[in-house]
Amino acid sequence: MQEFNVSLTDKPGELATVASAVGDQGINILGCVGMGRSTASVTMVTDDEEATAKVLKDMGRDFEVNELILTTLSNKPGALAEMATRLSDEGINIISFYIMKMEMDAADVALTTDNPSKTKEILGI
C-alpha cells in the first residue's frame, strides 16, 4: 500500500479539485490528511494506487509516493506509544501515521518511516 503526498497551493478549492478528480475516476480515498500552514499539501491513501498516480500526473500535480506499512495495534491505552517507542529506540523516524480502522479490541494502522525494511523487521511484518 502507498500514500500520495500531493502539493497544493494554499487557496480555496484546491482540496476539492484533487478530491473531485480522484473521485470522478471511481477511486475511493481510504485515509487522508491535509495541511495548509507554510506549504499546502494533502496526503491520501486510496484503493487504486495506479489510477491515483495517473490522475495526479494527468492533472500536472507535484506528488510523491511513499510505502505504507500496515500493522494492527491493540485498542488500549499506551499501544501507540509502545510501537512508537520500539521504533524510536531503533532510530526509526515515523513520517506519517494513519488509523485506518478501529474496532473494540484492535486498531488497523498504516505508517511511513525513514526505513521501511527495518520497520517491518521490528514490527514482525
Regions found by a protein language model. Give the residues of each.
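A conserved regulatory-domain signal marking ACT and ACT-like small-molecule sensing domains
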Residues: 1-125
